[in-house]
């Protein structure tokens, strides 16, 4: 299985980036315009973890080269729903974040694309023992010949929830063992069956709005009403991908990088030293330090 690990992107190259992403995506669009795009929350799962100041929240796009047709967006909320003693927590607004840069991600030439908030942009602090819920909403664009005849395209959305427990004597975060050889009971992703693609007229806008298409290219997806069954267990994070993710978490949100909310970045060459890039073991150590500081 191929994973997406592009090179870091600087702010100075953002315009070039948009052109290259558009060009590469357009070539891919010509060759393949139908299939099932699946989006899964692969970490955390419905399991128990030690308290940590930062718990990675990682999504996987399967058949990801088709994702640009959907102009994808993900919104994430995290709630403490039960205290460790079984009582109900005092109400507080959810910790939230949007992966708004997904619509410009380079999904091309990859079977699987990982998307996640990087450390400095992650608002989630799973430091309190108890039962938590991570609720995520996948939002995607669709169009039909009839809708485009009326100069509109439509957004659909689907919401999923994962329940996890935070407890002091539980396992530390390990992305490799935490996603390999595991059952996915209670996990459910979103699968969208693209049957065709259509050209978007320049006059088209979102239904009920005046805003125009902001995604890559000028092609949108036509989908079926039947919903394919998702299979989150198909995706795991191997050591190489975990190392890349650890570096992205550590360095991917700095001012030198264009994408601050979605990232599958490989560490820059000058960050790959022992001092600059965490190994897989170092990733566990990073979260372990956060956990230790919370005890």
Give the positions of each predicted feature.
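Fungal secretory targeting signals
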Residues: 1-36, 273-295
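C-terminal low-complexity/intrinsically disordered tail segments in eukaryotic proteins
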Residues: 205, 212, 216, 220-221, ...
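C-terminal GPI-anchoring signal of eukaryotic secretory precursors
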Residues: 232-236, 240-284
């Amino acid at each position: 299985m191929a994973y997406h690990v592009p090179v870091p992107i600087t702010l100075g190259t953002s315009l070039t980036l948009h052109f290259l992403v558009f060009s590469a995506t357009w070539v891919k669009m010509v060759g393949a315009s139908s299939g099932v795009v699946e989006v899964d929350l692969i970490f955390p799962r419905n399991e128990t973890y030690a308290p940590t100041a930062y718990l990675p929240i990682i999504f996987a796009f399967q058949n990801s080269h088709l994702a640009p047709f959907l102009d994808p967006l993900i919104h994430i909320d995290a709630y403490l729903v039960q205290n460790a003693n079984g009582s109900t927590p005092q109400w507080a607004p959810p910790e939230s974040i949007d992966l708004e840069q997904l619509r410009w991600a380079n999904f091309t030439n990859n079977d699987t694309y990982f998307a996640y908030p990087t450390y400095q942009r992650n608002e989630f602090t799973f430091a309190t023992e108890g039962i938590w819920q991570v609720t995520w909403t996948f939002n995607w664009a669709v169009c039909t010949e009839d809708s485009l005849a009326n100069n509109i395209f439509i957004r659909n959305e689907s919401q999923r929830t994962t329940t996890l427990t935070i407890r002091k004597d539980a396992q530390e975060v390990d992305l490799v063992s935490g996603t390999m050889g595991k059952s996915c009971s209670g996990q459910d992703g979103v699968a969208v069956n693209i049957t065709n693609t259509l050209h978007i007229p320049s006059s088209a806008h979102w239904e009920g709005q005046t805003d125009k298409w902001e995604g890559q290219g000028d092609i949108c997806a036509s989908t079926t009403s039947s919903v394919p069954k998702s299979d989150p267990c198909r995706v795991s994070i191997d050591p190489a991908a975990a190392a890349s993710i650890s570096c992205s978490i550590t360095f991917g949100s700095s001012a030198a990088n264009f994408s601050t909310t979605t990232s599958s970045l490989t560490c820059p060459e000058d960050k790959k030293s022992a001092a600059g890039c965490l190994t897989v073991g170092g990733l566990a150590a990073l979260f372990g330090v956060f956990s230790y500081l919370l005890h």
